[in-house]
Amino acid sequence: MIFLEIIKRELQIAMRKNAEILNPLWFFLLVITLFPLVIGPDPKLLSRIAPGIAWVAALLSALLSFERLFRDDFIDGSLEQLMLTAQPLPMTALAKVVAHWLLTGLPLILLSPIAALLLSLEVNIWWALVLTLLLGTPVLSCIGAIGVALTVGLRKGGVLLSLLVVPLFIPVLIFASSVLEAAGLNVPYGGQLAILGAMMVGAVTLSPFAIAAALRISLDN
């Protein structure tokens, strides 16, 4: 399938440029490491704000990884070739989003035990963090891909990209923080997780069409 071939191609290209994969992950760990040093040794304060720190670090590290999503394909002309394949453009866009999540969102989930250790998170809060990252990071990848598709033709689109996508990240951040707060209070958080899951399903279903339309606009201009 062309869909799987595109994912494989994206992973192979990323492995050749491993710095672009590792930099956001290092940034994630750096933010999580520095926050406890800044706020001091108060364990109560750290336990109260630590879950939010983890999600803010994940959001910022995601921003660092977005620009390369369509940039190289746009520069070398392969993006136009992908648009001419037999596969519909929304499916091509979804394949690139899946590859982006495998390279950025999944590693953040795998790094969450280290984050929990650095932030002294309890096991139940760490598990809630894993669930929110599992449901929330695909939404970040989908929204970020729409922003990248709109700004891919601009020379300095990084600032504009941030202005476009960060406000759209806020609902994910709010519900993820609500889940983590509920986990800290040992109260049920199934409702918040269901909303995050609905966001993920909606983003994965609808964003490929928005990305495809944005790419056509960018290439036409």
From Swiss-Prot:
Subcellular location: Cell inner membrane
One cellular component term from this protein's GO annotations in UniProt: plasma membrane
A Pfam entry, by short name: CcmB
Record-annotated membrane-spanning stretches: 21-41, 46-66, 101-121, 126-146, 157-177, 193-213
Membrane topology, record value: Multi-pass membrane protein
Cell inner membrane in keyword set: yes
MF annotations from Gene Ontology: heme transmembrane transporter activity
Main location: membrane
One biological process term in Gene Ontology: cytochrome c biosynthetic process
Entry keyword set: Cell inner membrane, Cell membrane, Cytochrome c-type biogenesis, Membrane, Transmembrane, Transmembrane helix, Transport
Role according to the record: Required for the export of heme to the periplasm for the biogenesis of c-type cytochromes.
NCBIfam families the UniProt entry points to: ccmB
Family to which this protein belongs: Belongs to the CcmB/CycW/HelB family.
Protein name as catalogued: Heme exporter protein B
Organism per entry: Haemophilus influenzae (strain ATCC 51907 / DSM 11121 / KW20 / Rd)
Chain's gene name: ccmB
